[in-house]
Amino acid sequence: LEGGVGALAVASGQAASAYAIQNIAKKGDNIVASSHLYGGTYNQFKNPMSDMGIEVRFVDPSDPNNFAEATDENTRAYYGEVLPNPSFEVFPISEVAEIGRPLGIPLIVDNTAAPVICKPFDHGAAVLIHSTTKFIGGHGTSIGGIIVDSGNFDWEAFPDRQPALNTPDPSYGGAVWTEAVKPLGPIAYILKARTTILRDMGAAMSPFNAFMFIQGLET
């Protein structure tokens, strides 16, 4: 559907947005996010994420330069929604991605509202998420989320900006993810999410919900 190199199914869209950030950011880090977000995501970023020590700096996405102005040495990602709920003001994917890439900052986008219609990876996004509850499921019968890795972001080129993927991970035997995955392809981000964040936090998608979402994709 999205043309990524790997994906991770989780228990909800909220789990997908949280894990997408926590995979590369820790206490003392920050992300710059569009202020035009689904209310649940906005609250997650403003309150629980802040309580964990990850600062979320909200900016008006109508001017992409706002992302650059809010960036500092501890910024780990940019975040936006392709078609925000409820405003539906189109997010400037290409412009924001172009600001972040030279700095080693990936753009993470929520494409829940526009599967098939929009291909964020073609416009420079590095990672995307969906609440699979919506169009992927299609029937409102199941709750789930998914994180998709484009494989198009060079995490290894920015070790200072992306230490989570470029320094030994004590939770996984000291693995350096960008090195460990080289025989497998450009999957450092999504493999780390699967083997550490999902393992430790536990928001796995139920097998029955996964079956329902596959049925939804088929129809």
Regions found by a protein language model. Give the residues of each.
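Conserved PLP-enzyme active-site core in the AAT-like
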Residues: 6-219
